[in-house]
Structure formats: structure tokens, C-alpha cells
């Protein structure tokens, strides 16, 4: 049997790490060193009407290419997620004050999460997949928001929506439409199918 290709996850996301680990994939972690905000701003300048799903895919591609160039013999898995509300693209909050602002803007509103995953080898992206989910936060009280921020802590700043749906953040929601893994940040079923096709997992 041929030796399986070494797999690298180009992400420092604990959630993505845990999803792949739970699925039985052997891999190492090498977070991509790219300036995401600079890329986002450049994309916005080039095309004000760019689709948020396309932004997620382009960022996932950039991460995959960056790590693959430094690890040409490995199979790289990279991902990105964007959040859009009425045409506005959100970034991860820098602190709890920004997290509060994000949640107040999303409160009672329907928004979209767009999650992209890319596979790269030898410096080139060879496969991508993008999925979207539609979510709506309930019209929670300020008292609940204050309590949530206190209990959830700085960890929510790792989520573009300032919520972690797999934890306490689930209580923020009124409606969720979409794949659970996509919402967490990695479309697992399409990714696992592609890894099996490539021989990185047993078919």
C-alpha cells in the first residue's frame, strides 16, 4: 500500500482542529501567515459588489497556497468563513466591545455565513468547496447580552459573528438553516469525500 500523503491543516482554529480530529484524520497544524484584512480591503476596492462567498473562497485559496508553497510535499487543507448582513461584510471582533457591537447589529436580523474549504498541493489549489447557511438571532435583551459576554468571554472573538454556536452562543438564535459543520467553519462531508477520493482517507 502506498504511503499516504502528509496532511496539514492551515488554520489555528481550535474548532476546525477538533472536527478533523474527531473524524479520524491524521494531520498537523500550520496556521497560514497571511494578512486577511489587507486581502479583504483589496477585494472590496477591486469590486464593491463582490459576493461574500467569493471572499471566503479567495481567502481559503490564499491560505492554502501560502502553506503549500512552504510544504510542497504535503496536502494542505485551508478554510475561511465570512458573515454578511444586508450587503455588509463582518470581520472577527478584536475584543469584547466589538463583539457587543456585532451582536447588537445582528440581533433580530437574518444573516448569512459563507464557509469555504480549499485543498492545495505544490503551491496550487486543486479543489475548493463553498457552502452557505442562513441564521437569525433572536431579539435578546441587553441584560442577556451583558450576561452572555461575561460568561462566554474572549473566546467568542475567534468567531466572526461573536458567537460560538457549539457552546453558550446557541441560546442567541431563533432560527438556523444550514449544515452544522458549515456553521462551525468547515464543510466536513464534502471535504471528507474529497479526501477519500485522493486516498488520504480509507474509501
Please place each PLM-identified region on the residue numbering.
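N-terminal beta1-alpha1 ligand-phosphate binding loop
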Residues: 2-25
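Anionic-ligand binding patches
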Residues: 2-7, 46-203
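Cofactor-binding loop segments of dinucleotide-utilizing enzymes, especially the Rossmann-like FAD-
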Residues: 12, 32, 122
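Surface-exposed, flexible loop/turn segments at secondary-structure boundaries
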Residues: 15, 35-37, 125
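A short beta-strand-loop structural module common to alpha/beta enzyme folds
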Residues: 27-38
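N-terminal beta-loop-helix "entrance" segment that forms/cooperates
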Residues: 38-48
